[in-house]
Amino acid sequence: MNKIALVTGAAGGVGRAVVARLAAQGWQLIVTSRQAEHLTAAFGDQHLQVAADCSTVAGARQILQAAKDHQMVPTALAHCVGNIRLGAMHRMSEADFNDCLSANLISAFHTLSAFVGALREARSPGAAVLVSSAAARIGTPNHEAVAAAKAGLEGLVRGAAASYAANGIRINAVAPGIMETPAAAGIIASPAAREGAARQYPLPGIGTPDELAELMVWLLSDSAARVTGQVWSLDGGFSSIRPLVK
């Protein structure tokens, strides 16, 4: 039986890394982005490519319907959609806050709902992994919007994991610190900013999409068959221990 996975936000840094690892393991892939040209640029004519906005009910359902039209029922979901909107809450516009919620929380809810619905219709078990953030786990200045969105995502993971465990559907999340991705490029644009960001972690450094993808793909695998409702930190100890100040 073919292994079929759905990767949302597939043209981004984390999405591409997840796609590469799953493809190397022989998975058939459904890859999504809001812009078709981004998918073409990232993957050429590989994989089933679906341009859709998964932050809407219609967009999320469109993705799963496209899979069904190609006789594909994904049993794994890697939801890699998200953005970073920084700024103290008294200075953040309503539009930026809503955009942050839409990209990081609402898209996760609608995509996970459509994915679970497809699995239940097929009477199939499955696994999903979503991307949270260290900002949901520890207070960080100017991260109010993304912290609220990602904390909501973590609650979604735990609630959905409880609801669908009896169906054999596992749902987990990963919570990275800052990584080498287009979304974070502005934060670490200068050498000084990069060094400052790297030093804030007890294990200093900037994370890579590939190391996060490795953890995500493991959570989707049979090796994690008894893991559900968990949020796995990959943040150099940022959210759990203090760095040694020298």
Model-derived features: positions:
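Conserved glycine-rich cofactor-binding loop
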Residues: 11-12
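Substrate-binding pocket helix/loop in short-chain dehydrogenase/reductase
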Residues: 88-89, 93-101, 197
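Active-site helix of classical SDR
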Residues: 112, 149, 157
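Alpha-helical segment proximal to the catalytic Tyr-Lys
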Residues: 117, 162-166, 225
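Residue(s) in the substrate-gating loop at a strand-loop-helix junction
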Residues: 133
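C-terminal helical subdomain
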Residues: 173, 192-227, 234-236
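Short C-terminal tail/terminal secondary-structure segment
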Residues: 228-246
